[in-house]
């Protein structure tokens, strides 16, 4: 009887730590995580009133959750570049250098992707001043 109790205790403890449908940590250097963080940074840049394009500096934290597809909760840092929104000179945002001494922002995005539908949606995107500054 004690052996059964011990086995049940271990199994219950294990199942609680691997909760189905729960958020799981992801590698911040994962290619998909960087792709989705870049997408969210680009969307924030479009919505901002800044004269300059903003781009991804680094991914701080990332989690995923299996739903009908996959939801990603990504925290990342963005900063303005030297590229003006109404200017020319760079073909790709990745080529734009960061604007020196400009404040960085820390952003959190919830992104939902359903690969079989080729569908990716930004469900939530919020940024605030306070990332590291170069």
UniProtKB/Swiss-Prot annotation:
Its main location: secreted. Transmembrane segments: none annotated. Residues 1-17 form the signal peptide. Gene3D superfamilies: 3.10.450.10. Expressed by the venom gland. GO terms for molecular function: cysteine-type endopeptidase inhibitor activity. Keywords: Disulfide bond, Protease inhibitor, Secreted, Signal, Thiol protease inhibitor. It is found in: Secreted. InterPro entries: Cystatin_dom, Cystatin_sf, Prot_inh_cystat_CS. It comes from the Eukaryota. Residues 21-116 form the Cystatin domain. Disulfide bonds join 83-96, 107-127. The record marks 21 as: Reactive site. SUPFAM superfamilies: Cystatin/monellin. The keyword Cytoplasm does not apply. GO terms for cellular component: cytoplasm; extracellular space; vesicle. A motif (Secondary area of contact) lies at residues 65-69. Inhibits various C1 cysteine proteases. This protein has no toxic activity and its function in the venom is unknown. It may play a role as a housekeeping or regulatory protein. Belongs to the cystatin family. This is Cystatin-1.
């Amino acid at each position: 009887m004690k052996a059964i109790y011990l086995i049940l205790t271990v199994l219950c403890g294990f199942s609680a730590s691997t909760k189905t449908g729960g958020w799981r940590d992801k590698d911040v250097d994962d290619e998909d995580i960087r792709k989705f963080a870049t997408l969210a940074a680009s969307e924030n840049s479009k919505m901002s009133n800044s004269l300059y394009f903003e781009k991804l500096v680094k991914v701080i934290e990332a989690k995923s959750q299996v739903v009908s597809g996959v939801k990603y909760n990504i925290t990342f840092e963005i900063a303005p570049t030297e590229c003006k929104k109404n200017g020319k000179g760079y073909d790709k945002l990745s080529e734009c250098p960061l604007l020196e001494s400009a404040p960085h922002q820390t952003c959190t995005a919830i992104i939902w992707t359903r690969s079989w539908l080729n569908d990716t949606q930004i469900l939530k995107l919020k940024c605030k001043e306070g990332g590291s500054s170069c």
